[in-house]
Amino acid sequence: MINYMDRQVLSNMSVRITSQLKLSEEQYGNVEWAFGTAFAFGSLAFGFLVDKVSVRWLYPAVLLAWSAVGFATGFVRNYDSLLACRIFLGFFEAGHWPCALVVTHSVFSKEERPFGNSILQSGASIGAIITPIIIQGFFWYSQDDQAWRPPFQIVGIVGVFWAFAWCYSIPVGSFTRKKEEMKSESNSPNWFIDLLMNRRFWALVVMVISINTSWQLIRAWMPKFLQQGRGYSESIALYFNSAYFVATDIGCIGAGLLASRLTRLGRSVHASRLITYGLCSLLACLTCIAAFLPQGWLLLVVLLFVGAGTLGVFPCYYSFTQELSVTDLGKVTGILSFLGWIASSPVHRYFGRYVDQTKSFDLGLALVGLAPMLGLIAMLLLWPSTSQCKND
């Protein structure tokens, strides 16, 4: 929850902040690009570290680090200082996902991991739901031009309380890997070569790049699209952003429940995940309609369905990654996250440049919703059948 609060504070106030700091749309895109690139390298670093260091200690450490950077963002004065803060935030925030996936892998069985991962991802949405309400509260009571600064600091302080609560409530030795699953894999020193030779890995490379591109671009640019592209007020855009992340939460939980339900009805675990992913990808494609709708209730309703789809694909993706490796789970998820972020982050810069040149968000928004379909195609072409997997 807290990692998305830190992340969404900026995008929710992006119109106000870019105006006050006199940033172009491309510069705002550069800030998101820098965040994503730092997140990529952080994913790689913490992905390797989580296989060596206890999650019980690593998790609160990275959260304290990104909370401190989030707090410092409330003091930025120009483009360069904002850029620096987002770089450090991206790097340390990346430690969340390798740690979280080790936790869900330890707690849930193979069949229940899609639902467990949906709970994990939905927590991020809860943070994103709360953030616009906090921001609106500050704007309601203060008309000061600097009213955008305290929300960064409040969210940063919340992270400190979470870290202490974690250390107090989680016993030492928690979240060790399941022995029976550890024995099923060889501890080959050539694990990286084996990974590169694995068709399933390359299917997931395409998938993570595609879903990260659509989710992150819409997340970062939605407030600007609503305010600058469709003429909504800042207040309405903030309230809708909360509603949007309610929809993403529903999509995320719904995806996990659907995959688990299909498994109980007799579908294979893999087929259940793939069907769920495909349905969510179809919802994401609704950007092709939303991008060309005028201001009005229909636009907002379609965007809610887009949100449900673009986040609903993630529990399926996380469950696929957990089938690649147990002994090297942190490293594998870290590598995939690195590739997903390093490839998708530059899109923000070019999207911003396009908006500067055309004064329109429409075409870019329409195209980005199609991206998750590429992940589905890659899975169908590259992921081996169940019988082949058993023989590997």
Residue ranges, per PLM feature:
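Conserved MFS/SLC helix-loop-helix module at the cytosolic interface between two early adjacent transmembrane helices
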Residues: 41-79
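Structural signature of the two symmetry-related core transmembrane helices
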Residues: 57-71, 271-288
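Glycine-rich segments within core transmembrane alpha-helices of 12-TM secondary carriers
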Residues: 115-136, 248-252, 337-347
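Helix-breaking motifs and short loop linkers at transmembrane-helix boundaries and internal kinks
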Residues: 22, 54, 75-81, 231, ...
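Extracytoplasmic gate region of multi-pass secondary transporters
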Residues: 10-11, 198-255, 314, 318, ...
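Juxtamembrane intracellular "pre-TM" segments in multi-pass secondary transporters
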Residues: 173-205, 229
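Helix-loop-helix hairpin linking two adjacent transmembrane segments in secondary transporters
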Residues: 120-173
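Cytoplasmic helix-loop-helix junction between adjacent transmembrane helices
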Residues: 85-124
